[in-house]
From Swiss-Prot:
It is a single-pass type I membrane protein. It is an enzyme of class 3 (hydrolase). Belongs to the peptidase S10 family. The chain crosses the membrane at residues 521-541. Residues 588-599 have a biased composition (Basic and acidic residues). The gene is kex1. Residues 477-501, 586-631 are annotated as: Disordered. This is Pheromone-processing carboxypeptidase kex1. One of its GO terms (molecular function) is serine-type carboxypeptidase activity. Protease with a carboxypeptidase B-like function involved in the C-terminal processing of the lysine and arginine residues from protein precursors. Promotes cell fusion and is involved in the programmed cell death. Residues 1-35 form the signal peptide.
Length: 631
């Protein structure tokens, strides 16, 4: 879910009981479980309800970010299924504040969606096709994250600093991803989080450069914000503008006049009080929703105006009915390495976090966008056109008013604006886009507050193009995506796993990689064999000379520490290799194994993942005695 509304019923934010006996036993029997420091400790070996076939490579668990207040952030990471032209990592954050990024993982851009409360199926538009995905529950207290209840965060700079701590520690565990191109994505109130985190990353990189530190600088490439709460000064008035535009309220009507009065109060408060969350401004939305209640006691869904329900959208989307029980399942909790210190069950949105996070000092994140754009960071703002609470009218207005890189809004030159380009996807009107000076805006037709939930394939096509994914060397069935009727460069959406052409090309790619590894190790073996043959030949020659009565210098028996001795000892087990008399199987026993991966995961392993995979077999007897605790 995205932006929280005061209309949310209390049951949505209650904290349910979370297996207290199991939690206590975990702490007593396995006290180091919450202090995991290696990738193996986070490895997800199995996932209940996953589709048949090889499990996608994933890690999950907690990273400590605030030792003083027991603050831990929960993450769920998926390795990309295919590598295109470069390695990328997308960090996904949901909004709220206080709403879990498991929404994004299980209802929007993650590789799985729920068929029911215990069965997963593949998401055809998952963003993990060509990018690693890192979902993080933040700030502390959100979703599976936890902290002492009196230590929830209040300001955006606090949140950003804590997130930098998380990334520092996360990359220490998973260093193979630290050099990736990094994109930060999210929706709704994450429109406040994301620019602040981006600025904090830039400040960190600058500090490393100035101090000539050996720490790696993070390659921040772009930001993606969907239906974002970025500029309250434009978004609050857009409640009424959008309602007029969509025919929800008639201009000049009694209701229209009532809302105009509330809006004028809102604007006066924006000039004097906090700039991000203003109670008097939220009254405009609440009044509008109250007046849409019909005879069936149903009102407009504030996240999708095409729908009506009794809670005005607070129980939407419908997948929530399955997500919550799934994430409360004991086996899922174990599989995701949930710390026993997380004493309450998963809630989509935590009201305590949301109540605490009401910034009084922080400036709205829109203030940071010009500097980020001018520094070379590409930014994509996308909006589903059926969302009310963070509607596209407000987003378009903030773009029109924003000044950066010598222009205002989408100006390409003084008084000339970049044109809007029509976008069609698979023969259907998909929306339009505009671009100027590192900023891209996309309006998605027939999409809600959570556009990837409604349109997974279109949004995947959108994100691939924003990240400049090049699939020329990958293959697969290209998606039919066009701008102003002209086909775009080829990318593939949902065709990769089921594409015969792609599978054949991927298998060939793996074979070539294996052959390269084999050839390198084979060269080393060949050198050893040649040396062995030469020495062996020399010994035979000397033996024959001695046998024929020739005198010479006596050759001592090779010692165990000599090179010849080691070679002899290593091959005294019957696997003798002789020049001109060997087969490839014998060579395979000598060289390091090459790449042996399924075609759904081509990338680097974490250092100790193999150890984790072997651990259950090595410790089978001991694990039974420890009640099969998660390692």
């Amino acid at each position: 879910m995205g932006l929280l509304s005061f209309r949310q019923p209390s049951w949505r934010i209650s904290r349910s009981q979370f297996y207290p006996i199991w939690a206590l036993s975990q702490l007593l029997l396995n006290p180091i479980a919450v202090l995991a420091q290696s990738a193996a400790d986070y490895y997800v070996e199995s996932l209940p309800g996953a589709p048949e076939g090889p499990l996608l490579k994933m890690h999950a668990g907690h990273i400590e970010v605030d030792p003083e207040h027991n603050g831990h952030l929960f993450f769920w990471h998926y390795q990309n299924r295919h590598i295109a032209n470069r390695q990328r990592t997308i960090i996904w954050l949901n909004g709220g504040p206080g709403c879990s990024s498991m929404d994004g993982a299980l209802m929007e851009i993650g590789p799985y969606r729920l068929k029911d409360n215990e069965t997963l199926e593949y998401n055809e538009g998952s963003w993990d096709e060509f990018a690693n995905l890192l979902f993080v529950d933040q700030p502390v207290g959100t979703g599976f994250s936890f902290a002492n209840t009196n230590s929830y965060l209040h300001e955006l700079d606090e949140m950003a600093a804590q997130f930098i701590t998380f990334l520092e520690k996360w990359f220490a565990v998973f260093p193979e991803y630290e050099r990736d191109d990094i994109y930060i994505a999210g929706e709704s109130y994450a429109g406040q989080y994301i620019p602040y985190i981006a600025k904090a990353i830039q400040d960190r990189n600058k500090d490393i450069h100035e101090k000539q530190s050996s720490s790696a600088r993070w390659n921040l490439r772009g930001l993606l914000i969907g239906n974002g709460w970025i500029s309250p000064a434009e978004q609050y008035p857009a409640y009424l503008s959008f309602a007029y535009e969509e025919g929800l309220v008639e201009e000049g009507s009694k209701l229209g006049k009532e809302l105009e009065t509330l809006l004028s109060i809102c604007k006066s408060k924006m000039e004097t009080g906090p700039k991000i969350s203003i109670t008097d401004c939220e009254a405009v939305l609440n009044k509008l929703l109250d007046k849409t209640v019909d005879s069936n006691n149903q009102c407009i869904n504030m996240y999708d105006i095409r729908l009506r329900d009794g809670s005005c959208g607070t129980t939407w989307p419908p997948d929530l009915v399955d997500v919550k029980p799934y994430l409360h399942t004991y086996e899922v909790i174990q599989a995701l390495n949930i710390s026993p210190e997380k004493e309450s069950g998963w809630d989509e949105c935590d009201g305590n976090v949301g109540a605490a996070f009401r910034p009084q000092k922080s400036e709205p994140s829109v203030k940071l966008l010009p500097g980020l754009l001018e520094s070379g960071i590409e930014i994509l703002l996308f909006s589903g056109d059926k969302d009310l609470i963070c509607n596209h009218v407000g987003t378009e207005q903030l773009i029109s008013n924003m000044k950066w890189a010598g222009g205002t809004g989408f100006e390409t030159s003084p008084g000339v604006w970049a044109p809007r380009h029509d976008w069609t996807f698979e023969d259907e009107p998909a929306g339009y886009y505009q671009y100027a000076r590192n900023l891209t805006y996309v309006l998605l037709y027939n999409a809600s507050h959570m556009a990837p939930f409604d349109l997974p394939r279109r949004t995947r096509d959108m994100v691939d193009r924003f990240m400049h994914v090049d699939i020329a060397s990958i293959g697969g069935a290209p998606a039919d995506s066009r701008i102003d009727g002209e086909p775009l460069p080829q990318t593939s959406v949902g065709g990769q796993p089921n594409s015969t052409v792609h599978q054949e090309e991927e298998q060939q790619k793996i074979k070539e990689t294996e052959w390269n590894a084999y050839a390198k190790s084979g060269e080393a073996v060949l050198v050893v064999v040649i040396i062995g043959v030469l020495v062996w030949g020399f010994l035979i020659w000397r033996s024959r000379r001695r046998h024929n009565g020739y005198s010479g210098i006596a050759i001592k028996s090779p010692s165990r520490t000599s090179i010849m001795g080691r070679f002899h000892n290593n091959h005294s087990n019957g696997a003798d290799v002789e020049a001109g008399d060997f087969d490839e199987a014998e060579l395979d026993d000598l060289h390091s194994p090459g790449l042996d991966r399924e075609n759904y995961a081509v990338g680097e392993d974490s250092d100790d993942e193999a150890h984790r995979q072997d651990l259950p077999r090595a410790q089978e007897s001991s694990s039974k005695s420890e009640n099969n605790l998660v390692t």
